[in-house]
Amino acid sequence: MKLVLASNNRGKLAELQSMFSPLGVELVRQADLGVGEADEPFHTFVENALAKARFAAEHTGLPALADDAGLCVDAFGGQPGVQTAYYATRFGYEKGDANNVRALLEQMRGVASRRAAMVSTLVAVRSPDDPEPLIAVGRVVGEIATEPRGDGGFGFDPVMFIPEFGKTFAELPVEVKNAHSHRGRSAQQMLALMRERWF
């Protein structure tokens, strides 16, 4: 089954493709089908993911899978949340993973509580007007490290310290990270939902 991924993020594609391949699902980025990015005007992960999935399905004619994910820092009232990808731009930096990490570490300087959660909300639709979208949420709680560690992953992985492993996501082998990450958890839920309702 071909499923359009409502994202142009190559990191998300690689991570999700490895998780969905056992189901016989081939993920294709919407950009590879000539489709641009959907607007993300909402304040919650689920609303943005649903908007992206419907947009991709409408413009490709294929079932669609969308992920809206982000970092929610307790000391910042859950921010940056849905604005995670643009976090660095709030502090005068260009958009990008390295700048996001840099800005976060600068803002966390002197902050005692380093507790944070990575959240991934996956939404799948069979068509743009699917009345019963599949929704899966994965969440991992950890702490923001004081400096980047590790070379793997993307986004905030180098500073998302997971106490149960004693490492950041970027220090974990990819198969361990994928099994225990926020996206890994939401993907496992989504796979179960797809098996139950679509296959």
Curated annotation (Swiss-Prot):
One of its GO terms (molecular function) is ribonucleoside triphosphate phosphatase activity. Substrate binds at residues 7-12, 69, 154-157, 177, 182-183. GO terms for biological process: nucleotide metabolic process; purine nucleoside triphosphate catabolic process. Mg(2+) binds at residues 39, 68. Binds 1 Mg(2+) ion per subunit. InterPro entries: dITP/XTP_pyrophosphatase (IPR020922), ITPase-like_fam (IPR029001), RdgB/HAM1 (IPR002637). The active site is at residue 68. One of its GO terms (cellular component) is cytosol. Pyrophosphatase that catalyzes the hydrolysis of nucleoside triphosphates to their monophosphate derivatives, with a high preference for the non-canonical purine nucleotides XTP (xanthosine triphosphate), dITP (deoxyinosine triphosphate) and ITP. Seems to function as a house-cleaning enzyme that removes non-canonical purine nucleotides from the nucleotide pool, thus preventing their incorporation into DNA/RNA and avoiding chromosomal lesions. This is dITP/XTP pyrophosphatase. It comes from Paracidovorax citrulli (strain AAC00-1) (Acidovorax citrulli).
